């Protein structure tokens, strides 16, 4: 063990290996089998998942992935690799003995394999950074579960730090604010990934984190309450999710006199299917068809310099 080497595990949700129906089916099965995501009784849910949902959704989702796939592969994985390399370069420039690895909760590279690589490299400590600014049991906690699984085969468990959330981190808030320049009469919509309403009732404080992030960004930009709002996207199934829903809101705003909209997905650290297809394309079409005049998607922070600096400072605080 190198007593001076620090390991950093960047963690995100994951992506299929390729935009094909079999690959997407494997990915969705792993994702939707996580009880942190869907907490229905296992036998009942697995029957529904395997015989009703996967056969129907896999080809549809594969088609959507093909529309956003690039020469570098999945946008989420490509951008996550850029973030990993940018952070590694940052610590190298600072002459800090830090090794940055990337792991995904679902798909490849897995969190378990990333954990194993760090331990085999002889790190004396691991800092786990889930790339979810706002804590949720459906995302952040799943990272901790996977990291713990990665330690099960280790005789010696190295010390570790787990960054719980950074929804109100000043550098993260500033990085978001720096990407936003509202035009005249343009309203800002913060679209966060939704979770079932029941999860909030049971103690998940994700919506409070989302609201705090949006409020801090709005304050940084000196926006009035009428200039911005928070909605939730990507609901799944028949259960009630956090509201207001992004799609329904965008379809009704034009009739309320809001003709120009800028949408930012502040909870997504990297652009992915939910931002590039659902928000940048599908919801844009719905808003314009409902009478909107201008719809602008503000890209995720991805690997931009402000974002990398914010993440680096979060890590440095734990070294």
From Swiss-Prot:
Keywords: Cytoplasm, Heme biosynthesis, Iron, Lyase, Metal-binding, Porphyrin biosynthesis. Belongs to the ferrochelatase family. The keyword Iron applies. GO terms for biological process: heme biosynthetic process. Catalyzes the ferrous insertion into protoporphyrin IX. This is Ferrochelatase. Fe cation binds at residues 193, 274. It catalyses: heme b + 2 H(+) = protoporphyrin IX + Fe(2+). It is found in: Cytoplasm. It is an enzyme of class 4 (lyase).
